[in-house]
């Protein structure tokens, strides 16, 4: 290698006395704040040798510092227990808070809302309201100092780690301790949350890193012991690995399974903070009065480097560890979370779910002569197929038990969260060749209460293609069922709040990839609600055992599809609706039985979903059973989006003689499914954001409601809320007008007519209310004497004027759109002429 994997970016003298603490700004990763024994807080631009700003005010040494989410405020806790907040834009102290009886050694800002938490050597954890200028809650429970604390990304819990070796989880809403983790044997020095899942990682002086499930509050596993204590840790933004900073090295762990992939020797001594930015790890350490900034190139470390090698060798499914996900779910850049949830499948419609040690375990028996074992972290699935090959693969935490000799089904809707609907793998010994006109295949995946795991490229089962054949599955009247299912699912979507939902990515079997004689469709699956029965078997009579050729059977099955139009899509974007007769054209929809719940696969991703809501809903939904799907609390049912076997995946080749009318049909199907998946995900993300706004709204805190909308930068959410504000005249004050106008201006950049109409309607109302005083204030003479209220009012008028001028500049282009938008633009133009004349 010509380039070092780790190097020192800079080293500088930060204080005139010893440095006690430092923090990297998470928003930009370009700024650094340090606190020292010289009673000062210094602000630095990373890469520059001189301080941007020095903040004074404390009368004792600084023991903890941090930025808020926007890098506008800095909080610093001192040895006296006093906490001071500085506004960096004005370089002045905005709050001085007292309450701790000893050193304040940890601080953290709430992810949204004007709150922050502090931990002290007095063993107390305090929550502070910046607006009320005081402590709103004190949590007692630690027996020694609180070293580290973090708010959960949803802002509902705060997690603290202490010198007493205990990690405690506190519920901010209920104001009480939820649980505590006591497995560490040394003081807690660092903790971090998984970016997509309900997972907490903790690092300790006992030289181990431990992973905790925040839904079941169980220990998932432990990494180490290492050569030194874990001083800092941070999840890679892709969520696959956690980066652990030790005394003089960096260790890279995967959490499922837990193993150390790589170690990098770095020269940092007392590492204090680190952050991942654009594929680089930035670490900051201090020694006496000096601060060192270190960079580790993650693209040159395992497993990222292994992923790059795999891509060059023709395995594009390996993804880089740059921290950026190329797949976007919605306009807010929510990152796609593909499912790692896996299921085992077999011949008969039996589904037997058992819970062992708090997890589901699955065994399938098709032929006692062979076994296929699959394991992922905490669950294992054994499956006996006709081959004598034994495989070991990482899967999800769900496993299902199926037996080929019993024909019963046991479903559990209790707090264990197990769900029915495991698909069945159909062996060629039980299926004859397909007849034209009624052939289709449905790929379904089972889901559980814990279906929030992220995709792992290695977690794709390998199946011997020669052992499987297509299945012929009839269905009831699809027109009635589609309407019923669409209404039911939309109702469920409106009442639930996962952040991300999408189907697991099915990939081509390596066995079929290596054997040119085998087709790409390696396995065809069917729902448990549609077992192989005599009325499901085509006119071939008895089923030949193991003699059915996959190529011929698949060709016959696929040749039955003659898709001639794709324009119509229902709300579920399903695939594979069987024809009602041979002369009709159909969209791609999946079939289900009329009354049985369908197996589904869902995932939670994007940002951290509210765990409290998840727990509160267990009782409400635990026994829900509807025509669409059955699910436990917090799990969002969704259709299985991707056809896993009927059509080729990327990089696969379908036999030429199959005679598909259009060579791009499978791509069209994938596009349809992908768009539906994005729609569902964006709806759930929007719901989550609206609930954040609602919490402020219920407290009549309109100012912060508008402020939270501005931070979200989501046009859909903005339009939803502004549509309500338009009808509430009492909200349209001058103070709120200054906050609303930037949102309305930004909304004019949307390409949707609905958003434009909402913005133009509210703009028209504001111009009629405040247009005249805004424009007349510009020419008004200056007042004599000091009138603070008048000056504030004129300042608001000036800000409104700037935004209104931006709006006027946008109107000519909007007028060319025509329709209702052009009509609204004309009315707004007339209003501007009236108030400015």
UniProtKB/Swiss-Prot annotation:
Which stretches does UniProt call biased (Polar residues)?
Answer: 376-387, 412-450
Record-level GO cellular component terms: Cul4-RING E3 ubiquitin ligase complex; cytoplasm; katanin complex; microtubule; microtubule cytoskeleton
Q: In residue terms, where are the WD repeats?
A: 14-54, 57-96, 99-138, 141-182, 184-222, 225-265, 267-304
Q: Where is the composition biased (Low complexity)?
A: 509-520
Q: Where in the cell is it found?
A: Cytoplasm, Cytoskeleton
**Per UniProt, which keywords does this protein have?**
Cytoplasm, Cytoskeleton, Microtubule, Repeat, WD repeat
- Respond yes or no to whether keyword Membrane is given for this record: no
Gene inactivation effect: The double mutant ktn80.3 ktn80.4 exhibits normal growth, but the quadruple mutant ktn80.1 ktn80.2 ktn80.3 ktn80.4 has a severe dwarf phenotype, with small and round dark-green rosette leaves as well as wide and short petioles, probably due to cell elongation defects, and associated with a complex cortical microtubule (MT) network with stable entanglements. Plants missing KTN80s have a disruption of KTN1 recruitment at MT crossover or branching nucleation sites, leading to an abolishment of MT severing.
Q: Which intervals carry biased composition (Basic and acidic residues)?
A: 553-563, 580-595
> At which positions is motif DWD box?
115-131
Q: Name one GO molecular function term.
A: microtubule binding
Q: Please describe the organ and tissue distribution of this protein's expression.
A: Expressed in siliques, flowers, leaves, stems and roots.
What superkingdom does the record give?
Eukaryota
Which InterPro entries has this protein been placed in? G-protein_beta_WD-40_rep (IPR020472), Katanin_C-terminal (IPR028021), KTNB1 (IPR026962), WD40/YVTN_repeat-like_dom_sf (IPR015943), WD40_repeat_CS (IPR019775), WD40_repeat_dom_sf (IPR036322), WD40_rpt (IPR001680)
A Gene Ontology biological process noted in the UniProt record is:
microtubule severing
PROSITE patterns associated with the record: WD_REPEATS_1, WD_REPEATS_2, WD_REPEATS_REGION
- Segments of this protein annotated with the region Disordered: 307-328, 358-462, 501-614
Family assignment from sequence similarity: Belongs to the WD repeat KATNB1 family.
Q: What does this protein do?
A: May participate in a complex which severs microtubules in an ATP-dependent manner. This activity may promote rapid reorganization of cellular microtubule arrays. Confers precision to microtubule (MT) severing by specific targeting of KTN1 to MT cleavage sites such as crossover or branching nucleation sites. Together with other KTN80s, regulates cell elongation by modulating MT organization.
Q: What is known of its domains?
A: The DWD box is required for interaction with DDB1A.
Q: How does it assemble?
A: Component of KTN80-KTN1 complexes composed of a hexamer of KTN1-KTN80 heterodimers that sense microtubule (MT) geometry to confer precise MT severing. Interacts directly with AAA1/KTN1, and weakly with KTN80.1 and KTN80.3.
The protein in question is named Katanin p80 WD40 repeat-containing subunit B1 homolog KTN80.4
Q: Which organism is it from?
A: Arabidopsis thaliana
């Amino acid at each position: 290698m010509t380039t070092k994997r780790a190097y020192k970016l800079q080293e500088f003298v930060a204080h005139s006395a010893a440095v006690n603490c430092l923090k990297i700004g998470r928003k930009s990763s370009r700024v650094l704040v340090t606190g020292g024994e010289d009673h000062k807080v210094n602000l630095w631009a990373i890469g520059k040798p001189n301080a941007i700003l020095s903040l004074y005010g404390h009368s004792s040494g600084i023991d903890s510092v941090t930025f808020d989410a926007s890098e506008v405020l800095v909080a610093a806790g001192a040895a006296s227990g006093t906490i001071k907040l500085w506004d960096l834009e004005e370089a002045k102290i905005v709050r001085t808070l007292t309450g701790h009886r000893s050193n304040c050694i940890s601080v953290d800002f709430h992810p949204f809302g004007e709150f922050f938490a502090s931990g002290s050597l007095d063993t107390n954890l305090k929550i502070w309201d910046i607006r009320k200028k005081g402590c709103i809650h004190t949590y007692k429970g630690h027996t020694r100092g609180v070293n580290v604390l973090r708010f959960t990304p949803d802002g509902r819990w705060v997690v603290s780690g202490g010198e007493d070796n205990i990690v405690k989880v506190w519920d901010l809403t209920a104001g009480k301790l939820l649980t505590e983790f006591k497995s560490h044997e040394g003081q807690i020095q660092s903790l971090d949350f998984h970016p997509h899942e309900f997972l907490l990682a903790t690092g300790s002086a006992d030289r181990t890193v431990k992973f905790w499930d925040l839904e079941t509050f169980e220990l998932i596993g432990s990494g180490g012991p290492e050569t030194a204590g874990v001083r800092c840790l941070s999840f890679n933004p892709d969520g696959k690995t956690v980066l652990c900073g030790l005394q003089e090295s960096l260790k890279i762990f995967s959490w499922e399974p837990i193993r150390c992939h790589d170690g990098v020797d770095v020269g940092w001594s007392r590492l204090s903070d680190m952050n991942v930015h654009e594929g680089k790890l930035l670490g900051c350490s201090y020694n006496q009065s000096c601060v060192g900034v270190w960079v580790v190139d993650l693209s040159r470390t395992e497993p990222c480097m292994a992923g790059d090698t795999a891509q060059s060798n023709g395995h594009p499914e390996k993804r880089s560890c740059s921290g950026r996900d190329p797949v976007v779910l919605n306009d807010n850049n929510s990152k796609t979370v593909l499912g790692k949830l896996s299921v085992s499948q077999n011949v008969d419609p039996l589904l037997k779910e058992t819970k062992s040690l708090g997890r589901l375990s699955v065994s399938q028996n098709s032929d006692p002569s062979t076994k296929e074992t699959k394991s992922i972290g905490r669950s294992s699935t054994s499956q006996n197929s006709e081959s004598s090959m034994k495989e070991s693969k990482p899967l999800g935490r769900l496993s299902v038990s199926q037996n080929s000799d019993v024909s019963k089904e046991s479903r559990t809707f209790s707090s264990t969260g197990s769900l029915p609907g495991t698909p069945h793998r159909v062996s060629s010994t039980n299926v004859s060749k397909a007849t034209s006109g009624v052939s289709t295949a449905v790929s379904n995946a089972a889901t559980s209460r814990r279906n929030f795991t992220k995709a792992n490229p290695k977690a794709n089962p390998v199946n011997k293609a020669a052992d499987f054949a297509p299945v012929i599955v009839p269905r009831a009247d699809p027109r009635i069922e589609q309407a019923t299912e669409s209404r039911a699912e939309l109702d469920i979507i409106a009442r639930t709040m996962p952040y991300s939902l999408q189907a697991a990515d099915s990939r081509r079997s390596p066995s079929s990839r290596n054997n040119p004689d085998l087709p790409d469709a390696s396995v065809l699956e069917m729902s448990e609600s549609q077992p192989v029965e005599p009325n499901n078997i085509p006119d071939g009579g008895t089923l030949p055992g193991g003699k059915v050729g996959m190529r011929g059977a698949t060709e016959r099955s696929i040749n039955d599809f003659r898709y001639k139009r794709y324009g119509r899509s229902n709300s579920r974007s399903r695939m594979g609706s069987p024809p009602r007769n041979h002369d009709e054209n159909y969209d791609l929809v999946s079939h289900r039985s009329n009354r049985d719940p369908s197996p589904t696969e869902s995932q939670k991703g994007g940002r951290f979903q509210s765990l409290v809501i998840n727990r509160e809903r267990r009782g409400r939904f635990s026994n829900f059973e509807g025509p669409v799907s059955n699910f436990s609390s917090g799990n969002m049912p969704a259709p299985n989006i991707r056809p896993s076997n009927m059509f080729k995946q990327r990089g696969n080749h379908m036999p030429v003689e199959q005679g598909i009318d259009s060579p791009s049909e499978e791509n069209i199907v994938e596009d349809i499914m992908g768009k539906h998946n994005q729609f569902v995900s964006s709806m759930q993300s929007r719901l989550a954001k609206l609930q954040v706004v609602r919490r402020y709204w219920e407290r009549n805190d309109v100012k912060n409601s508008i402020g939270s909308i501005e931070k979200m930068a989501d046009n859909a959410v903005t339009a939803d809320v502004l549509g309500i504000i338009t009808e509430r005249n009492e909200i349209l004050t001058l103070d709120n007008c200054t906050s609303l106008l930037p949102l309305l201006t930004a909304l004019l950049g949307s390409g949707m007519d609905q958003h434009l109409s909402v913005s133009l309607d509210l703009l028209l109302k504001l111009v009629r209310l405040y247009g005249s005083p805004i424009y007349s204030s510009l020419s008004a003479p200056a007042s004599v004497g000091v009138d603070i209220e008048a000056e504030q009012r004129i300042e608001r008028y000036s800000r409104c004027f700037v935004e209104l001028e931006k709006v006027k500049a946008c109107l000519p282009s909007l007028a060319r759109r025509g329709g209702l938008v052009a009509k609204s633009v004309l009315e707004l133009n007339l209003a501007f002429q009236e108030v400015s004349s």
